[in-house]
Swiss-Prot record:
N-methyltransferase with a substrate preference for (+-)-pavine and (S)-reticuline, but also active with the protoberberines scoulerine and stylopine and, to a lesser extent, tetrahydropapaverine (THP) and tetrahydropalmatine. Is not active on (R)-reticuline, cryptopine, glaucine, codeine, canadaline, noscapine and berbamine. S-adenosyl-L-homocysteine binds at F96, S97, G135, N159, Q163, D185, V186, V201. The active site is at C331. The gene is PavNMT. In the presence of a racemic mixture of tetrahydropapaverine (THP), one molecule of (S)-THP binds in a productive mode, while one molecule of (R)-THP is bound next to it in a non-productive mode. The (R)-THP seems to inhibit the release of products from the enzyme when higher concentrations of the racemic substrate are added to the reaction. This is Pavine N-methyltransferase.
Amino acid sequence: METKQTKKEAVANLIKRIEHGEVSDEEIRGMMKIQVQKRLKWGYKPTHEQQLAQLVTFAQSLKGMEMAEEVDTLDAELYEIPLPFLHIMCGKTLKFSPGYFKDESTTLDESEVYMMDLYCERAQIKDGQSILDLGCGHGSLTLHVAQKYRGCKVTGITNSVSQKEFIMDQCKKLDLSNVEIILEDVTKFETEITYDRIFAVALIEHMKNYELFLKKVSTWIAQYGLLFVEHHCHKVFAYQYEPLDEDDWYTEYIFPSGTLVMSSSSILLYFQEDVSVVNHWTLSGKHPSLGFKQWLKRLDDNIDEVKEIFESFYGSKEKAMKFITYWRVFCIAHSQMYSTNNGEEWMLSQVLFKKK
């Protein structure tokens, strides 16, 4: 018991040091490399038989869970980040998921547009369709589709009041009359309306039971309609965001709630009770890795302005520094993780479904 307590205390002390900005970027990268190797050692099995059994067991375990856990304090803070901060860290469209980097010279703004164009191409968007964007955030994809396909009616769903207000304000500025934003939790949303195309980008990560989620969404897919899903993944194995061991500072610091899932690239193929896979792609982890690097650079280049924004928003210098450090470590750790083995471990999966 004494050893266990000592390890827990060591992690708690490390997190305090991180929060106080006492751990250098290089130390964070080094610690993340160790964490990544531990996760790979945990995830990879000696035989393919064991590897497949692990994934199938994990997929089956999800089927016994609720669709999603209640949004907790951390998630609420992530949804209600001060908008001026997002304008600094993210690109012009405020896309809060990875962009597509054609090469290292691609700018963050370009990467956001390239990725959303890829979504539209792979989801087979055509003018005149009805589009549903689940968990639309600040409307990057909703507004992109609405501008590019003026004949489309685009509906976005968000559970954030500030996000809805921002999107509707952008619609006025862009003279868009083909956008509707519904303020609702996706897991509680009900409608008899069906849509030609449905997007679920960076949403699956917040779900537990993919079967229940896809069953619900399938009722909103029109005849001959399609559902496009993008999610973060490891190429082979899946896991809950729970501490790997007692030395796991990363999960304790970045995802203390334990409500997220890191799925595998193929896991959604095991959930075809109500939808059928039409196509499936993966994108290298280089894309999110480069995106996190760009976020970090923009944050650091504007650090004084960020301090002012956070002090005003959170009410104290101490809390401002805590959140600045959190976002810096978030970017450093994930840039490191997604770059592992040249982007061939953690990556992005995109799946196109049709209704059964």
